[in-house]
Regions:
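S-adenosyl-L-methionine
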Residues: 1-62, 70-78, 101-132
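Conserved glycine-rich SAM-binding loop
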Residues: 67
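Short beta-strand element of Class I
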Residues: 82-85
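Conserved SAM-binding loop
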Residues: 97
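Conserved SAM/SAH-binding beta-strand->alpha-helix loop
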Residues: 90
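Conserved beta-strand/loop positions that form the S-adenosyl-L-methionine
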Residues: 64, 87
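C-terminal substrate-binding/active-site "lid" region of AdoMet-derived donor-dependent transferases
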Residues: 160-195
Length: 195
């Protein structure tokens, strides 16, 4: 038995093993385009950040579902050769990212200026990035909401209609979850996509 020690909450689910509809749902999304209209705030955020990305001319790293942006800061520190976009749907969480003058996240180094935090809908932002022909060097999905109820499969990134965009963005994918079934399902979805 493997004992994992950490401060993450224990995930409970009515699902044992891979979701029985996983293959069907993933294959459906791989065969059909996601045509939902873009939300205005995400479209505007993309247009603004697209200019910054072009000006930088560096490899692009996504830190999706970044919460308060602590992981984004550390990724930026570890990858000075790249630009990092930390993205979350919650403006409240992002507002808790330390700014100059606040002591937190290892006393933020003000020389780390290769990242931006964005409040966006990832379903839209990832598709916009694909349309703009962006290719990532890395994509971090660190502890996304696992949606552990079996009926919520399509709320998980690998079960959602935007999953093909995650694949098209490319790059080294770093997925972490406190629910092992989430990781196993994501791996199966990648296999179904030929990755």
């Amino acid at each position: 038995m493997i004992e994992i020690i950490g401060d993450s909450r224990i995930i409970t689910s009515n699902q044992n093993g891979l979701n029985e509809k996983l293959d069907e749902v993933v294959l459906k999304h791989l065969q059909h385009d996601f045509k939902k209209p873009y939300q205005t705030h995400t479209l505007e955020a993309f247009k603004k950040i697209e200019k910054w990305v072009e000006q930088q001319g560096k490899p692009i790293i996504f830190d999706s579902c970044c919460g308060v942006g602590e992981s984004t800061y550390h990724i930026a520190k570890a990858h000075p050769e790249a630009i990092i976009l930390g993205m979350d749907k919650s403006a409240d969480r992002l507002s808790k990212h330390p700014v100059d003058g606040e002591l937190s996240i290892d006393d933020l180094d003000s020389n780390i200026n290769n990242y931006q935090l964005l409040q966006v809908n990832l379903n839209d932002f990832w598709r916009l990035a694909v349309e703009a022909n962006w290719t990532l060097s890395h994509h971090y999905l660190l502890y996304p909401n696992p949606w552990p109820k079996a009926k919520h499969l399509q709320r998980r990134w690998h079960g959602s209609a935007v999953f093909p965009s995650i694949i098209e963005l490319g790059g080294k994918l770093d997925l972490r979850s406190n629910w092992f079934t989430y990781v196993e399902e994501f791996q199966r979805a990648l296999q179904l996509a030929g990755k």
